[in-house]
Protein backbone atom coordinates (compact mmCIF):
# COMPACT_ATOMS: atom_id res chain seq x y z
CA UNK A 1 0.00 0.00 0.00
CA UNK A 2 1.04 3.58 -0.27
CA UNK A 3 1.16 6.79 1.66
CA UNK A 4 -0.66 10.08 1.16
CA UNK A 5 1.63 12.53 -0.65
CA UNK A 6 -0.63 15.57 -1.04
CA UNK A 7 -3.85 17.03 0.36
CA UNK A 8 -5.41 20.13 -1.15
CA UNK A 9 -8.67 21.98 -0.38
CA UNK A 10 -10.51 24.74 -2.21
CA UNK A 11 -13.69 26.77 -1.77
CA UNK A 12 -16.48 25.72 -4.20
CA UNK A 13 -20.27 26.21 -4.31
CA UNK A 14 -23.09 23.96 -3.12
CA UNK A 15 -26.58 23.58 -4.62
CA UNK A 16 -27.84 26.71 -2.85
CA UNK A 17 -25.04 28.92 -4.12
CA UNK A 18 -23.29 28.89 -0.73
CA UNK A 19 -19.57 28.14 -0.41
CA UNK A 20 -18.46 24.71 0.72
CA UNK A 21 -15.21 22.76 1.00
CA UNK A 22 -13.79 20.47 -1.68
CA UNK A 23 -10.77 18.31 -0.79
CA UNK A 24 -8.39 16.34 -3.01
CA UNK A 25 -6.06 13.60 -1.76
CA UNK A 26 -3.19 12.08 -3.77
CA UNK A 27 -1.16 8.94 -2.97
CA UNK A 28 2.34 7.86 -3.97
CA UNK A 29 0.97 4.99 -6.10
CA UNK A 30 -1.25 7.34 -8.14
CA UNK A 31 -4.46 7.07 -6.12
CA UNK A 32 -6.71 10.14 -6.27
CA UNK A 33 -9.80 11.06 -4.27
CA UNK A 34 -12.02 14.13 -4.33
CA UNK A 35 -14.88 14.92 -1.94
CA UNK A 36 -17.30 17.81 -1.52
CA UNK A 37 -19.00 18.61 1.77
CA UNK A 38 -22.78 19.19 2.11
CA UNK A 39 -24.54 21.67 4.42
CA UNK A 40 -27.91 21.67 6.23
CA UNK A 41 -30.71 24.28 6.54
CA UNK A 42 -32.40 22.95 9.68
CA UNK A 43 -29.54 21.86 11.92
CA UNK A 44 -29.59 20.11 15.28
CA UNK A 45 -27.95 21.97 18.17
CA UNK A 46 -25.72 18.97 18.91
CA UNK A 47 -24.31 18.69 15.38
CA UNK A 48 -20.61 18.98 14.63
CA UNK A 49 -19.79 22.59 13.79
CA UNK A 50 -19.35 23.87 10.27
CA UNK A 51 -16.70 26.59 10.11
CA UNK A 52 -17.83 29.75 8.28
CA UNK A 53 -15.71 32.86 7.88
CA UNK A 54 -18.29 35.39 9.08
CA UNK A 55 -16.94 38.09 6.73
CA UNK A 56 -20.12 39.86 5.58
CA UNK A 57 -18.28 41.28 2.56
CA UNK A 58 -17.75 37.79 1.11
CA UNK A 59 -20.65 35.43 0.38
CA UNK A 60 -22.75 37.17 3.07
CA UNK A 61 -20.46 35.80 5.78
CA UNK A 62 -20.74 32.20 4.58
CA UNK A 63 -17.26 31.85 3.08
CA UNK A 64 -15.18 28.80 4.05
CA UNK A 65 -11.65 30.09 3.45
CA UNK A 66 -10.72 29.43 7.08
CA UNK A 67 -11.81 25.78 6.79
CA UNK A 68 -9.88 25.50 3.50
CA UNK A 69 -6.81 27.00 5.17
CA UNK A 70 -7.17 24.51 8.04
CA UNK A 71 -7.03 21.64 5.54
CA UNK A 72 -4.10 23.03 3.58
CA UNK A 73 -1.99 24.31 6.47
CA UNK A 74 -2.99 22.35 9.60
CA UNK A 75 -4.39 18.97 8.51
CA UNK A 76 -2.29 18.26 5.40
CA UNK A 77 1.12 18.26 7.19
CA UNK A 78 -0.29 15.86 9.81
CA UNK A 79 -1.64 13.23 7.43
CA UNK A 80 0.85 13.40 4.56
CA UNK A 81 2.94 10.24 4.92
CA UNK A 82 0.14 8.22 6.55
CA UNK A 83 -1.06 4.99 4.93
CA UNK A 84 -4.09 5.91 2.78
CA UNK A 85 -6.00 2.70 3.58
CA UNK A 86 -5.78 3.21 7.34
CA UNK A 87 -9.05 5.16 7.51
CA UNK A 88 -9.56 4.62 11.26
CA UNK A 89 -6.09 5.94 12.16
CA UNK A 90 -6.47 8.93 9.83
CA UNK A 91 -9.91 9.81 11.22
CA UNK A 92 -8.57 9.44 14.77
CA UNK A 93 -5.69 11.79 13.90
CA UNK A 94 -8.19 14.36 12.55
CA UNK A 95 -10.32 14.14 15.71
CA UNK A 96 -7.28 14.52 17.98
CA UNK A 97 -5.87 17.37 15.90
CA UNK A 98 -9.13 19.28 16.35
CA UNK A 99 -9.39 18.39 20.04
CA UNK A 100 -12.95 19.65 20.58
CA UNK A 101 -16.17 17.72 21.20
CA UNK A 102 -17.95 19.30 18.21
CA UNK A 103 -15.03 19.74 15.76
CA UNK A 104 -15.42 23.49 16.13
CA UNK A 105 -11.69 24.28 16.02
CA UNK A 106 -10.83 23.01 12.53
CA UNK A 107 -14.44 22.75 11.34
CA UNK A 108 -16.43 19.60 10.60
CA UNK A 109 -16.53 20.76 6.97
CA UNK A 110 -12.70 20.69 6.82
CA UNK A 111 -12.40 17.35 8.64
CA UNK A 112 -15.16 15.59 6.70
CA UNK A 113 -13.79 16.69 3.33
CA UNK A 114 -10.45 15.08 4.19
CA UNK A 115 -12.02 11.93 5.67
CA UNK A 116 -14.15 11.26 2.57
CA UNK A 117 -11.40 12.17 0.07
CA UNK A 118 -9.00 9.75 1.81
CA UNK A 119 -11.51 6.89 1.38
CA UNK A 120 -11.97 7.74 -2.28
CA UNK A 121 -8.21 7.88 -2.88
CA UNK A 122 -7.73 4.48 -1.21
CA UNK A 123 -10.53 2.93 -3.30
CA UNK A 124 -9.06 4.47 -6.45
CA UNK A 125 -5.59 3.12 -5.70
CA UNK A 126 -6.97 -0.38 -5.12
CA UNK A 127 -9.08 -0.20 -8.27
CA UNK A 128 -12.27 -0.86 -6.29
CA UNK A 129 -15.64 0.89 -6.43
CA UNK A 130 -16.07 2.97 -3.26
CA UNK A 131 -18.99 0.89 -1.91
CA UNK A 132 -16.92 -2.29 -2.22
CA UNK A 133 -13.83 -0.73 -0.64
CA UNK A 134 -15.92 0.44 2.33
CA UNK A 135 -18.21 -2.58 2.68
CA UNK A 136 -16.36 -5.58 1.26
CA UNK A 137 -17.87 -8.38 -0.81
CA UNK A 138 -21.10 -8.39 1.22
CA UNK A 139 -22.05 -4.82 0.20
CA UNK A 140 -24.99 -5.60 -2.07
CA UNK A 141 -28.22 -4.15 -0.65
CA UNK A 142 -29.65 -1.27 -2.67
CA UNK A 143 -31.61 1.19 -0.50
CA UNK A 144 -35.31 1.98 -0.66
CA UNK A 145 -35.42 5.66 -1.67
CA UNK A 146 -37.24 8.06 0.66
CA UNK A 147 -38.10 10.72 -1.91
CA UNK A 148 -39.01 14.20 -0.76
CA UNK A 149 -41.61 15.35 -3.28
CA UNK A 150 -43.50 17.99 -1.27
CA UNK A 151 -41.80 20.60 0.91
CA UNK A 152 -42.88 22.82 3.77
CA UNK A 153 -41.21 24.19 6.91
CA UNK A 154 -37.65 25.51 6.67
CA UNK A 155 -37.26 24.12 3.13
CA UNK A 156 -40.04 26.24 1.63
CA UNK A 157 -41.78 29.61 1.84
CA UNK A 158 -45.34 28.35 2.31
CA UNK A 159 -47.87 27.68 5.07
CA UNK A 160 -47.22 23.95 5.43
CA UNK A 161 -45.61 23.20 8.82
CA UNK A 162 -44.23 19.71 8.13
CA UNK A 163 -40.86 20.09 6.43
CA UNK A 164 -40.93 17.09 4.09
CA UNK A 165 -43.54 14.74 2.67
CA UNK A 166 -41.91 11.72 1.06
CA UNK A 167 -42.80 8.61 -0.89
CA UNK A 168 -41.16 5.20 -0.48
CA UNK A 169 -41.65 2.69 -3.34
CA UNK A 170 -41.56 -0.39 -1.10
CA UNK A 171 -43.36 -2.62 -3.62
CA UNK A 172 -40.68 -2.38 -6.31
CA UNK A 173 -38.62 -5.43 -7.30
CA UNK A 174 -35.38 -3.49 -7.83
CA UNK A 175 -33.86 -0.08 -7.18
CA UNK A 176 -34.24 0.77 -10.87
CA UNK A 177 -37.98 0.08 -10.67
CA UNK A 178 -38.29 2.01 -7.38
CA UNK A 179 -36.65 5.06 -8.96
CA UNK A 180 -38.94 4.83 -11.99
CA UNK A 181 -42.01 4.64 -9.73
CA UNK A 182 -40.79 7.66 -7.76
CA UNK A 183 -40.13 9.70 -10.90
CA UNK A 184 -43.55 8.83 -12.35
CA UNK A 185 -45.29 9.85 -9.11
CA UNK A 186 -43.23 13.07 -9.04
CA UNK A 187 -44.48 13.98 -12.55
CA UNK A 188 -48.01 12.92 -11.63
CA UNK A 189 -47.86 15.21 -8.58
CA UNK A 190 -46.79 18.11 -10.78
CA UNK A 191 -49.85 17.55 -12.99
CA UNK A 192 -52.17 17.26 -9.96
CA UNK A 193 -50.81 20.49 -8.45
CA UNK A 194 -51.09 22.31 -11.79
CA UNK A 195 -54.71 21.19 -12.20
CA UNK A 196 -55.49 22.60 -8.72
CA UNK A 197 -53.88 25.92 -9.68
CA UNK A 198 -50.85 25.51 -7.40
CA UNK A 199 -47.30 26.65 -8.05
CA UNK A 200 -44.99 23.88 -9.32
CA UNK A 201 -41.61 25.50 -8.60
CA UNK A 202 -39.26 23.19 -6.68
CA UNK A 203 -37.51 23.74 -3.33
CA UNK A 204 -33.97 23.06 -2.09
CA UNK A 205 -34.34 19.30 -2.33
CA UNK A 206 -36.20 19.14 -5.64
CA UNK A 207 -39.69 18.72 -4.16
CA UNK A 208 -42.62 21.00 -4.91
CA UNK A 209 -43.45 23.76 -2.43
CA UNK A 210 -47.02 24.89 -3.20
CA UNK A 211 -49.00 27.10 -0.84
CA UNK A 212 -51.32 24.33 0.35
CA UNK A 213 -54.02 25.04 2.92
CA UNK A 214 -52.92 22.42 5.46
CA UNK A 215 -50.58 19.55 6.23
CA UNK A 216 -53.37 17.06 5.52
CA UNK A 217 -53.97 18.56 2.09
CA UNK A 218 -50.33 17.72 1.32
CA UNK A 219 -50.92 14.05 2.25
CA UNK A 220 -54.18 13.89 0.29
CA UNK A 221 -52.55 15.44 -2.79
CA UNK A 222 -49.69 12.90 -2.71
CA UNK A 223 -52.18 10.00 -2.41
CA UNK A 224 -53.99 11.37 -5.47
CA UNK A 225 -50.68 11.63 -7.38
CA UNK A 226 -49.73 8.02 -6.47
CA UNK A 227 -53.09 6.73 -7.70
CA UNK A 228 -53.00 8.80 -10.90
CA UNK A 229 -49.54 7.36 -11.63
CA UNK A 230 -51.14 3.90 -11.48
CA UNK A 231 -49.81 2.73 -8.10
CA UNK A 232 -51.49 1.60 -4.88
CA UNK A 233 -50.81 3.71 -1.75
CA UNK A 234 -50.23 1.46 1.26
CA UNK A 235 -49.12 -1.48 -0.89
CA UNK A 236 -46.63 -0.42 -3.55
CA UNK A 237 -45.91 3.04 -2.15
CA UNK A 238 -45.79 4.23 1.47
CA UNK A 239 -45.62 7.78 2.81
CA UNK A 240 -42.95 9.26 5.08
CA UNK A 241 -42.73 12.62 6.84
CA UNK A 242 -39.93 14.73 8.27
CA UNK A 243 -41.66 17.06 10.70
CA UNK A 244 -38.42 18.80 11.82
CA UNK A 245 -40.27 19.61 15.06
CA UNK A 246 -37.36 21.51 16.60
CA UNK A 247 -38.26 24.25 14.08
CA UNK A 248 -41.84 24.33 15.44
CA UNK A 249 -40.95 24.13 19.14
CA UNK A 250 -41.18 27.26 21.28
CA UNK A 251 -38.75 27.05 24.21
CA UNK A 252 -40.60 29.75 26.14
CA UNK A 253 -43.91 27.93 26.47
CA UNK A 254 -42.65 24.38 25.76
CA UNK A 255 -45.23 23.92 23.00
CA UNK A 256 -45.30 23.31 19.26
CA UNK A 257 -46.49 26.22 17.13
CA UNK A 258 -47.97 25.03 13.84
CA UNK A 259 -48.32 28.43 12.24
CA UNK A 260 -49.68 27.12 8.94
CA UNK A 261 -52.48 25.36 10.83
CA UNK A 262 -52.84 28.25 13.29
CA UNK A 263 -52.64 25.92 16.30
CA UNK A 264 -50.40 25.36 19.31
CA UNK A 265 -49.92 21.79 20.57
CA UNK A 266 -48.38 20.10 23.62
CA UNK A 267 -46.16 17.02 23.19
CA UNK A 268 -49.14 14.77 24.01
CA UNK A 269 -51.29 16.56 21.43
CA UNK A 270 -48.56 16.17 18.79
CA UNK A 271 -48.41 12.42 19.48
CA UNK A 272 -52.22 12.17 19.26
CA UNK A 273 -52.11 14.08 15.96
CA UNK A 274 -49.56 11.63 14.52
CA UNK A 275 -51.71 8.70 15.68
CA UNK A 276 -54.66 10.23 13.82
CA UNK A 277 -52.61 10.80 10.63
CA UNK A 278 -51.19 7.25 10.74
CA UNK A 279 -54.72 5.84 11.08
CA UNK A 280 -55.87 7.79 7.99
CA UNK A 281 -52.86 7.58 5.66
CA UNK A 282 -50.26 4.88 4.79
CA UNK A 283 -47.45 6.58 6.74
CA UNK A 284 -44.55 4.22 7.47
CA UNK A 285 -41.93 6.70 8.73
CA UNK A 286 -41.93 9.87 10.86
CA UNK A 287 -38.70 11.79 11.41
CA UNK A 288 -38.12 14.21 14.30
CA UNK A 289 -41.75 14.13 15.40
CA UNK A 290 -40.83 16.13 18.51
CA UNK A 291 -38.12 18.59 19.58
CA UNK A 292 -34.58 17.25 19.93
CA UNK A 293 -34.66 17.89 23.70
CA UNK A 294 -38.22 16.60 24.27
CA UNK A 295 -37.14 13.10 25.32
CA UNK A 296 -40.37 12.51 27.25
CA UNK A 297 -42.40 13.34 24.16
CA UNK A 298 -40.25 11.05 22.01
CA UNK A 299 -40.69 8.25 24.54
CA UNK A 300 -44.47 8.67 24.44
CA UNK A 301 -44.42 8.69 20.63
CA UNK A 302 -42.33 5.50 20.61
CA UNK A 303 -44.68 3.79 23.06
CA UNK A 304 -47.73 4.72 20.97
CA UNK A 305 -46.43 4.21 17.42
CA UNK A 306 -42.99 2.55 17.60
CA UNK A 307 -44.37 -0.91 16.79
CA UNK A 308 -45.86 0.10 13.43
CA UNK A 309 -44.13 3.29 12.28
CA UNK A 310 -40.43 3.94 11.77
CA UNK A 311 -39.52 6.80 14.15
CA UNK A 312 -36.34 8.41 12.86
CA UNK A 313 -34.04 10.54 15.00
CA UNK A 314 -32.24 13.26 13.05
CA UNK A 315 -31.82 16.34 15.28
CA UNK A 316 -32.50 13.89 18.13
CA UNK A 317 -29.43 11.70 17.48
CA UNK A 318 -27.29 13.83 15.10
CA UNK A 319 -25.40 10.72 13.83
CA UNK A 320 -23.70 10.65 17.23
CA UNK A 321 -23.08 7.35 19.07
CA UNK A 322 -23.39 9.03 22.50
CA UNK A 323 -26.82 10.47 21.67
CA UNK A 324 -27.91 7.23 20.00
CA UNK A 325 -26.79 5.11 22.98
CA UNK A 326 -28.89 7.36 25.24
CA UNK A 327 -31.90 6.89 22.93
CA UNK A 328 -31.49 3.12 22.83
CA UNK A 329 -31.24 2.97 26.63
CA UNK A 330 -34.36 5.14 27.10
CA UNK A 331 -36.36 3.31 24.42
CA UNK A 332 -36.69 6.38 22.24
CA UNK A 333 -37.22 6.07 18.47
CA UNK A 334 -36.37 3.00 16.41
CA UNK A 335 -34.26 4.50 13.63
CA UNK A 336 -31.41 6.96 13.10
CA UNK A 337 -30.85 9.37 10.23
CA UNK A 338 -27.24 9.21 9.07
CA UNK A 339 -25.70 12.47 7.87
CA UNK A 340 -21.94 12.37 7.42
CA UNK A 341 -21.52 16.08 8.14
CA UNK A 342 -23.40 15.90 11.45
CA UNK A 343 -20.53 13.92 12.97
CA UNK A 344 -17.64 14.77 10.65
CA UNK A 345 -15.70 11.57 9.87
CA UNK A 346 -16.40 8.38 7.95
CA UNK A 347 -15.34 6.17 10.89
CA UNK A 348 -17.78 7.81 13.30
CA UNK A 349 -20.53 7.55 10.67
CA UNK A 350 -19.95 3.79 10.34
CA UNK A 351 -19.85 3.45 14.15
CA UNK A 352 -23.31 5.05 14.40
CA UNK A 353 -24.75 2.73 11.71
CA UNK A 354 -23.25 -0.31 13.44
CA UNK A 355 -24.62 0.70 16.84
CA UNK A 356 -28.09 1.27 15.38
CA UNK A 357 -28.20 -2.12 13.68
CA UNK A 358 -27.04 -3.97 16.79
CA UNK A 359 -29.92 -2.40 18.74
CA UNK A 360 -32.49 -3.31 16.07
CA UNK A 361 -32.76 0.29 14.89
CA UNK A 362 -32.71 1.04 11.16
CA UNK A 363 -30.24 3.52 9.65
CA UNK A 364 -31.39 5.91 6.91
CA UNK A 365 -28.44 7.39 4.99
CA UNK A 366 -29.22 11.02 4.17
CA UNK A 367 -28.25 14.04 2.11
CA UNK A 368 -28.47 17.65 3.34
CA UNK A 369 -30.55 20.47 1.85
CA UNK A 370 -27.33 22.14 0.65
CA UNK A 371 -25.84 19.41 -1.57
CA UNK A 372 -23.24 18.99 -4.30
CA UNK A 373 -22.54 16.64 -7.20
CA UNK A 374 -20.67 14.35 -4.75
CA UNK A 375 -22.42 10.96 -4.60
CA UNK A 376 -20.52 9.35 -1.68
CA UNK A 377 -23.70 8.76 0.35
CA UNK A 378 -24.98 6.39 -2.36
CA UNK A 379 -21.87 4.24 -1.88
CA UNK A 380 -22.18 4.46 1.93
CA UNK A 381 -25.80 3.23 1.77
CA UNK A 382 -24.75 0.13 -0.21
CA UNK A 383 -21.48 -0.39 1.72
CA UNK A 384 -23.36 -0.64 5.02
CA UNK A 385 -26.42 -2.49 3.61
CA UNK A 386 -28.42 0.29 5.31
CA UNK A 387 -31.52 -0.46 3.23
CA UNK A 388 -32.82 3.12 3.05
CA UNK A 389 -31.59 6.39 1.54
CA UNK A 390 -33.05 9.87 1.80
CA UNK A 391 -31.73 12.07 -0.98
CA UNK A 392 -34.50 14.29 -2.27
CA UNK A 393 -36.82 14.28 -5.26
CA UNK A 394 -35.88 12.83 -8.66
CA UNK A 395 -35.22 16.42 -9.71
CA UNK A 396 -32.15 18.72 -9.55
CA UNK A 397 -28.77 17.28 -10.46
CA UNK A 398 -27.43 17.47 -6.89
CA UNK A 399 -30.13 14.94 -5.87
CA UNK A 400 -30.21 12.84 -9.05
CA UNK A 401 -26.40 12.35 -8.86
CA UNK A 402 -26.98 9.98 -5.92
CA UNK A 403 -29.78 8.09 -7.67
CA UNK A 404 -27.73 7.69 -10.84
CA UNK A 405 -24.80 6.34 -8.81
CA UNK A 406 -27.13 3.77 -7.23
CA UNK A 407 -28.28 2.72 -10.72
CA UNK A 408 -24.63 2.20 -11.69
CA UNK A 409 -23.97 0.18 -8.53
CA UNK A 410 -27.05 -1.99 -9.12
CA UNK A 411 -25.86 -2.65 -12.69
CA UNK A 412 -22.36 -3.49 -11.46
CA UNK A 413 -23.67 -5.91 -8.82
CA UNK A 414 -25.87 -7.61 -11.41
CA UNK A 415 -27.86 -10.61 -10.13
CA UNK A 416 -26.25 -10.32 -6.65
CA UNK A 417 -27.96 -6.95 -6.02
CA UNK A 418 -30.70 -7.05 -3.37
CA UNK A 419 -33.63 -4.62 -3.06
CA UNK A 420 -35.42 -5.32 0.22
CA UNK A 421 -38.48 -3.12 -0.22
CA UNK A 422 -40.78 -3.41 2.80
CA UNK A 423 -38.32 -5.82 4.46
CA UNK A 424 -36.00 -2.85 5.03
CA UNK A 425 -38.25 -1.96 7.97
CA UNK A 426 -36.94 -4.70 10.25
CA UNK A 427 -37.58 -2.35 13.21
CA UNK A 428 -41.37 -2.70 12.89
CA UNK A 429 -43.41 -5.43 14.55
CA UNK A 430 -46.10 -5.67 11.87
Curated annotation (Swiss-Prot):
Signal sequence residues: none
Job of this protein:
Catalyzes the reversible conversion of 2-phosphoglycerate (2-PG) into phosphoenolpyruvate (PEP). It is essential for the degradation of carbohydrates via glycolysis.
Sorted alphabetically, the Gene Ontology cellular component annotations on this record are:
cell surface; extracellular region; phosphopyruvate hydratase complex
Molecular-function annotations in GO: magnesium ion binding; phosphopyruvate hydratase activity
* Cell compartments where the protein resides: Cytoplasm; Secreted; Cell surface
Q: Which organism is it from?
A: Geobacillus thermodenitrificans (strain NG80-2)
* Reaction(s) this enzyme catalyzes, per UniProt: (2R)-2-phosphoglycerate = phosphoenolpyruvate + H2O
HAMAP family for this protein:
Enolase
UniProt record similarity statement: Belongs to the enolase family.
- Record protein name field: Enolase
Give the residues annotated as coiled coil: none
What does the note under cofactor report? Binds a second Mg(2+) ion via substrate during catalysis.
The protein's required cofactors: Mg(2+)
Amino acid sequence: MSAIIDVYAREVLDSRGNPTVEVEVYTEEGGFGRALVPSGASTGEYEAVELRDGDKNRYLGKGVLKAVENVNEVIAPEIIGLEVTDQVAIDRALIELDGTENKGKLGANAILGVSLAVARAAADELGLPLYQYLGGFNAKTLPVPMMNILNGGAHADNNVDIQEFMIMPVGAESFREALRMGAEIFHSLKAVLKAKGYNTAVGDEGGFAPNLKSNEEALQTIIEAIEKAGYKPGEQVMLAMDVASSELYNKEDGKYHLEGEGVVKTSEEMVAWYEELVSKYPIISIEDGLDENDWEGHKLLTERLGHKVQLVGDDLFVTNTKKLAEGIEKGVGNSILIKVNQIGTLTETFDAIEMAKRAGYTAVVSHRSGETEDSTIADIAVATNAGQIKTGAPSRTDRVAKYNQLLRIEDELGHTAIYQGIRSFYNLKK
